[in-house]
Amino acid sequence: MQLLTIGINHHTAPVALRERVAFPLEQIKPALVTFKNVFLGPHAPNAPEAAILSTCNRTELYCATDDRAAREGAIRWLSEYHRISVDELAPHVYALPQSEAVRHAFRVASGLDSMVLGETQILGQMKDAVRTATEAGALGTYLNQLFQRTFAVAKEVRGTTEIGAQSVSMAAAAVRLAQRIFETVSDQRVLFIGAGEMIELCATHFAAQSPRELVIANRTAERGQRLAERFNGRAMPLSDLPTRMHEFDIIVSCTASTLPIIGLGAVERAVKARRHRPIFMVDLAVPRDIEPEVGKLKDVFLYTVDDLGAIVREGNASRQAAVAQAETIIETRVQNFMQWLDTRSVVPVIRHMHTQADALRRAEVEKAQKLLARGDDPAAVLEALSQALTNKLIHGPTSALNRVNGADRDSLIDLMRGFYQHAPRSNDQSGH
């Protein structure tokens, strides 16, 4: 079995492409079934394994397969599933085999490959991806072991380095950008659209600035109300957004919608109602919640996750010593995992040896049982059984020794000596 990771992320693709390749949560299980059965082959010698990690910043397919054409098949499947041409998608895709796939998984879970260096959210997202793949019946020995090692490495990196210390989160970056637009956030009305983890983080950071008003708009009213109460804010129905957008100076959106929920026309009307007072908008969703054309309006300052990345990277630069330490830990653990993977490569051979030996055993036992049933001497039957098993079991090694020459033969002789040096001795040889 070969490990392979196929994906795109914020390093290789803009948000405009990432949002088209993202998987809504409810689509991941059926997508995994299709991916396994159609492109990795349901009747392969070993059942293929797969997991999908889809976040704001990355979409990745983790695979374990015997199919040597899995790389091309996975890229083709990804493009066909999302109705994007291979020519458009392929330049942005990375394909990481074996140790590169292992190293990548370790780095992602440890926060080294995140836009926010050392952030912890990705670890939870990866665990969710593993849980979903397990429920879909898509995981097996190889990916299970990879992800369990991945989580252990992430824990080690975060526990022994300062990789997450003083990190500038996306939420903190949003506040910093708002402070560049407005003299003070405390005079502004802030609207958050959504009620997930990212909105909760953003609300925490903005609430610390004591804004004039803090409002949560969410599709599920009860959840929005609970979050608003935590920050002494108010909740409003998401359906009120088109008629009330003009009330807010700062709008931060991050929902799981597959289509934009804020269009150009609605924002144009809001700007007009505000008499062209500026609106600061942050779209942290992938796919995007706000139509990108909104950013072209004169009095609107629209930022996406990619725009916030520059501010985040400023904070990342100061923690390079921790990065180096983390990379050292990861490299050691990659080598450990590859050693385990190497041992797995002999499992099919060992299984075949057991199957062959057991077939020989059953055949000879059946023959012996017939002789005993016929009334033959039990001692003679046992002797014949043992002789037959001995001859058949050493036939393969003996033939191999006779076929090879030179250095190969010397190596094989040494190997055979090692096989049989601990063979048990008979009673007459043991001196008892």
Swiss-Prot record:
Entry superkingdom: Bacteria
Site-annotated residues for Important for activity: H104
Pfam families attached to this UniProt entry: GlutR_dimer, GlutR_N, Shikimate_DH
UniProt: substrate binding residues: T55, C56, N57, R58, S114, E119, T120, Q121, Q125
Catalytic activity: (S)-4-amino-5-oxopentanoate + tRNA(Glu) + NADP(+) = L-glutamyl-tRNA(Glu) + NADPH + H(+)
Active site residues according to the UniProt entry: C56 (nucleophile)
Other comment: During catalysis, the active site Cys acts as a nucleophile attacking the alpha-carbonyl group of tRNA-bound glutamate with the formation of a thioester intermediate between enzyme and glutamate, and the concomitant release of tRNA(Glu). The thioester intermediate is finally reduced by direct hydride transfer from NADPH, to form the product GSA.
Entry function: Catalyzes the NADPH-dependent reduction of glutamyl-tRNA(Glu) to glutamate 1-semialdehyde (GSA).
Identification of the protein by name: Glutamyl-tRNA reductase
